[in-house]
Amino acid sequence: LWRYGWEKERVRPIGWYDEHGPRATMQVSPDGDYTQTGIRWNSQGYTSPTHKQYIEAPARSGLYYLHAKGESGAFFSFPWIVAPKEPSAAVAVLAANINWNAYNNFGGRSNYIHADGFVPTPTVNARYELKRYTDKRHLLFSEPDYPPLSFDRPEPLNFIPENDRITDPIEGRSACHVAPAEWRTVGWLEREGYAYDLYAETQLDSGVLDLDQYKVLIISAHPEYWSAKMYYRLKEWVFERGGKLMYLGGNGLNCEVEFLDEYTMKVKNGDQGGGFSHLQKIGKESRFDLCHESEAKLLGVTCSETGIMTGAPYRALKADHWVFAGTGLKDGDIFGENCLHMRCPGGASGHETDKMTVSSPAGCELLAKGLNPDDGGAEIVYHCTDSGGEVFAVGSISYPSALPVDDAISRITANVLNRFLG
């Protein structure tokens, strides 16, 4: 068991998992669509109490990883979100476990592959069989309803190599927008000396996380999928009770999910395509807007397709704002060139980017904009509420991957957090 902060800290060994019977601990894929029901690996064959092994959560909240290594030397790692028994800091951070589940295709389905259910015959060659790759007119979300997705599945997309350090480039397709990227956020907090409590997003929905026990909430990287309960709890906290929100990511709060039980969710994608350009045609800005309202009413920004899958630095537009104090930046200066995000290299504005819309709150200030193609740069915005609440949003999935290595990004983020902490 390891704790992932600014450094990887070995907590303790867990021991060997083995049994007398030949291949008794070999896992098998159950029959049926376990993307809906869960893989239930522990439901068979652990009848005796002596067969069971438990791990007690560490007392200190944080992002933990379990390291597993077989006799062959093959290595695998997976995250464990450890929330506090009681609030212990002024800052709460959410790990985006709902988003992890939406993108997890273990078992053959995710919210992006066979989102509307399995086809009658298994896919053999995705590029030749899935409309995602064969039909340029294909709309990602075109059905009125979508089968559930279970949290009870392994998450290979959150794997972090054994020898990776927090300042190493984030390689691969998935790692740069899920737990490995979020590690850069909590690691940066520790490097800068900020205490924090880490929670799973689902704990905001369940009520385990009480926002009123904290001054600041941080969400980062790619918190795309939220329940309506989560959204309105956060909005009420910011607009009515003076809560401070730091949105250090992109394409956030973009689509509603519903929890059927503790382990299962349904995504409310709608049947209008899902993209900003599709939804604009019917006067909507996001899938969340289809069911409720635009997330820009809270965040100040919402995601659009321009700039997608590119990376670029930001340009300062209002350098005399307190956000830029101590950076030495002037209007027109470029910052955020250094970034660990290797899927869309080029800078802290990237991967998927958010911009202001007509739904942004009155008084929302545009402080900087990314230099991505097609005017697709992420927009850094700030707004405050009558209750004393404040929101700082960076509009970019790539942003947290710049925190450990870009001085200006680090200083700007610290300026905001220091002000929000008072």
What spans do the regions from the language model cover?
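Catalytic-domain carbohydrate-binding cleft regions of carbohydrate-active enzymes
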Residues: 192, 206-230, 235, 248, ...
